[in-house]
């Protein structure tokens, strides 16, 4: 089964991650569901073959991996929005600085696996 990655918060860091994984030939653009509040900023990504969404719940529906790359002050709202749709098929990866795994578990109240990672935008050129 082909892996599908949802990137919630496809801004600088989220897009850098997606581009870096595609550049490395590990994934193809169509394996990414990119979500962002201002979806018009993802127009070029759609032209490159990425799936784009302005609905976070829709973005994670067919994903195995959910990467959360939002600003720290937005994480509670985003996790509240996603928690009913997250299940045991998902792996949640948080790129949000200053937010511990225990805090995420407290919000989502689920037993899904959670990983915390801290790449930087150099990941887009596989240097992070």
Spans of features found by a protein language model:
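Rossmann-like NAD(P)(H) cofactor-binding subdomain of soluble oxidoreductases
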Residues: 56-61, 65-68, 72-128
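NAD(P)+-binding Rossmann beta1-loop-alpha1 motif at the extreme N-terminus of oxidoreductases
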Residues: 1-54, 58-61
């Amino acid at each position: 089964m082909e892996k599908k990655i949802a990137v919630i918060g496809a801004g600088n860091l989220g897009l850098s991650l997606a581009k870096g994984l595609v550049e490395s030939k590990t994934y193809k653009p169509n394996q990414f569901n990119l979500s962002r509040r201002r979806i018009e900023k993802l127009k070029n990504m759609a032209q490159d073959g990425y799936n784009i969404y302005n609905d976070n719940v829709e973005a994670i529906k067919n994903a195995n991996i959910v990467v959360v790359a939002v600003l720290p002050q937005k994480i509670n709202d985003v996790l509240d929005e996603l928690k009913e749709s997250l299940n045991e098929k998902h792996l949640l990866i948080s790129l949000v600085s200053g937010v511990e795994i225990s805090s995420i578990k407290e919000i989502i109240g689920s037993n899904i696996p959670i990983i915390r990672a801290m790449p930087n935008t150099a990941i887009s050129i596989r240097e992070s």
